[in-house]
Amino acid sequence: NKEITSLLNRLRAPFNVNIVALAAAVAALDDTEFLKKTVENNSKERERYAAFCKDHNLFMIPSKANFVAVDFKGYDAQAIADKLLHQGIIVRPLLGYKLQDILRISIGKPSENDRLFNVLDKILKEMK
């Protein structure tokens, strides 16, 4: 019934989570050792992001989250995102929030961040 479906779609949360994903999330939150390691990794890697940004004259918005927001003022942030995607690295442009120079970048493992830094360094040099 289209009317009932429409009503249910208006009532549901914007991001549906199935029961398996919900159980996995609860289990992950109970794994305090994993959480501790993840928080430590994010903290250390966030410092590396800050150093990379400083070395490349980019502004990183202060954060305590599992991602950083980097201001690529003077560059075409969307073009950077596209070039990263072409290399298999996904970042999120914040154009929808009227932040055309900002990319949201998830903090990964050190090896993942190393790869991002290397690829991004080459892209920035190409775009100068």
Task: Pin down the residues of each PLM region.
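A short, structure-level motif marking secondary-structure boundaries and short turns
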Residues: E33-K36, K64-F67, K109
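PLP-dependent aminotransferase class I/II
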Residues: N1-K54, L58-I61
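A generic structural signal for alpha-helix starts
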Residues: E3, E33, Y75-D76, S111
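Phosphate- and divalent-cation-binding pockets in alpha/beta enzyme and binding domains
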Residues: L7, A24, D71, A79, ...
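Structured loop/turn residues at secondary-structure junctions
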Residues: A13, F72-K73, G108
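PLP-dependent enzyme catalytic core of the Aspartate aminotransferase-like
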Residues: K83-Q87, R92, G96-K128
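Conserved PLP-binding catalytic core of the aspartate aminotransferase-like
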Residues: S43, D55-Q87, L103
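Short loop/turn and capping residues at structural boundaries
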Residues: I19, K64-A65, L95
